[in-house]
Amino acid sequence: MARTTPIARYRNIGISAHIDAGKTTTTERILFYTGVNHKIGEVHDGAATMDWMEQEQERGITITSAATTAFWSGMAKQYEPHRINIIDTPGHVDFTIEVERSMRVLDGAVMVYCAVGGVQPQSETVWRQANKYKVPRIAFVNKMDRMGANFLKVVNQIKTRLGANPVPLQLAIGAEEHFTGVVDLVKMKAINWNDADQGVTFEYEDIPADMVELANEWHQNLIESAAEASEELMEKYLGGEELTEAEIKGALRQRVLNNEIILVTCGSAFKNKGVQAMLDAVIDYLPSPVDVPAINGILDDGKDTPAERHASDDEPFSALAFKIATDPFVGNLTFFRVYSGVVNSGDTVLNSVKAARERFGRIVQMHANKREEIKEVRAGDIAAAIGLKDVTTGDTLCDPDAPIILERMEFPEPVISIAVEPKTKADQEKMGLALGRLAKEDPSFRVWTDEESNQTIIAGMGELHLDIIVDRMKREFNVEANVGKPQVAYRETIRQKVTDVEGKHAKQSGGRGQYGHVVIDMYPLEPGSNPKGYEFINDIKGGVIPGEYIPAVDKGIQEQLKAGPLAGYPVVDMGIRLHFGSYHDVDSSELAFKLAASIAFKEGFKKAKPVLLEPIMKVEVETPEENTGDVIGDLSRRRGMLKGQESEVTGVKIHAEVPLSEMFGYATQLRSLTKGRASYTMEFLKYDEAPSNVAQAVIEARGK
């Protein structure tokens, strides 16, 4: 089968925003204008096409990044058909992992901001993730029809809060209930959409007289930004020559692809204005798969040789599984992005991470949660496979004759855990299956059994995250669970270097004995300097410990790291240097050295100023002005560090850093302090040393 859409006409984009910026409504309008969805689905009554899990419809927030394919030929049908694959990303901080994994497979992104609320805390998190993956992006300032809407204020916030270089591509004509359309700053014309057909048709008109001066000023700004793309254009511009429309667009495109500028559009998705021109901007300025660098990976050759795959059908097949979802009718759906080559349904591919073969039974392309079966997918495509047995988010699927492991995604460690048990004993096995399946879908969610209490423990990124897991167990798997009190994921570390710590395990009382003897140094590592939080240096000279026993020493210490001596929490940010020891020809064994290492570790840890670390959350509260004092007082009582506050149209925004252990039940407390008028967001920031009284209480509670 030949390719129907050339790869240069693909746009793989994410639509990303803060929780109430109107992202789902924006996506709905995209699906409407691209002709896929003939009745516009509204989030207001819970009927949006992209929000396809029941909870999303009830809560009105987007949880899962569904992938949808649409086609667009331009507002004035000025382009050949372009295929736009849209990945919808959640805006709530407990679902940061969903944003992270979608950023990894996108080529470009549309950042949606609310014209009233502007750049919100979650927008900053998403922005950092987009920076990490170097995703070119444009912005859409939505809700221009709302009270307090101010386009240029949001443009300024993109500059001051995100440190970006925003360049308006349009200006809003009017605002609030007087918002009627936009000025196109490239064409220098006003665009007026037709209300009678929900904005499908439009007219170019003259710019309103009272806006001509402002439009000229911002047009000049746009031209200067374009001229900065090359010396040639700069010379032409400085020489007083006019730049053509094609030159302006080409130059702006280049600068967006280089992540030098962010072009800003505006509108009101709800009022059917602006999304159409934003789609044109996606085609004009965001990259196709061939405009972004080739994907990096390593060959599966035992030497980890670096390799890359280009976005071409002629290269060997390679794809990244970026999401696993459970579908009530077909079981597991594995969403994947094809980076190179072609794959057909029925083909066998290699999961190079697990060294296992998988057969692509059926391949479907999703339109929200409706699906269309397809025979093949090619470089640049995003699709879902049915029937893959053992694929986890982040695995590489590739041609068995050309194995490659693509760059892995990094997933954060959970910061909160709770014990769960089924309400009826009969559901025990069903609960295990449900949790196993949910953990496969979501790598930031973990499940394990506590060895001491034999309880099932689930852990995640926040209270809302775990609420939704428990809710999904009930809805999708029919398992009702009782949940325990949330537990904080503390860590342990050391603050001081200790040298020459000895560990000896010797049992030699006749017959074959056991003998292992090690001497180590222990030292603190800079937090975050080592992704594993642990390093092991082998400094043995002259064979005082034979090489075959060194891994056993490392293993013995790593096993101790899982449950530290202070209170049984994992130990992080610590290094070990093994530099001396002794062995016995007959009695030494791997086990003996493992035990000797654990004795040395416990001994050294006590002397190395051990401390308890607690997770600190970045908390942002928006509250009416009259409640500011109460909110700040309450945060201080929770050991919060105030980091600043600013006045907003809607009240005051307070920035603080608060230990997670003090934030349980905060939503209820905030509601009663402000009569339900305040809102807050919270996300994990860092681990920090817990004060001695807090640490003592935790250690004592664990010791009971």
Swiss-Prot record:
Gene Ontology biological process terms from the UniProt entry: ribosome disassembly; translational elongation
Coiled-coil stretches noted in the UniProt entry, renumbered to this chain: none
EC number annotated for this UniProt entry: 3.6.5.-
Domain tr-type G stretches: 8-290
Presence of keyword Nucleotide-binding: yes
UniProt key word Electron transport: no
Reactions listed under catalytic activity: GTP + H2O = GDP + phosphate + H(+)
Annotated GTP binding sites: 17-24, 88-92, 142-145
Enzyme's top EC category: hydrolase
N6-acetyllysine PTM sites in chain numbering: 504, 643
Pfam families: EFG_C, EFG_III, EFG_IV, GTP_EFTU, GTP_EFTU_D2
Subcellular location: Cytoplasm
GO cellular component: cytoplasm; cytosol
Signal peptide positions on this chain: none
Single GO MF annotation: GTPase activity
General function of this protein: Catalyzes the GTP-dependent ribosomal translocation step during translation elongation. During this step, the ribosome changes from the pre-translocational (PRE) to the post-translocational (POST) state as the newly formed A-site-bound peptidyl-tRNA and P-site-bound deacylated tRNA move to the P and E sites, respectively. Catalyzes the coordinated movement of the two tRNA molecules, the mRNA and conformational changes in the ribosome.
Record family assignment: Belongs to the TRAFAC class translation factor GTPase superfamily. Classic translation factor GTPase family. EF-G/EF-2 subfamily.
Name this protein carries in UniProt: Elongation factor G
Gene: fusA
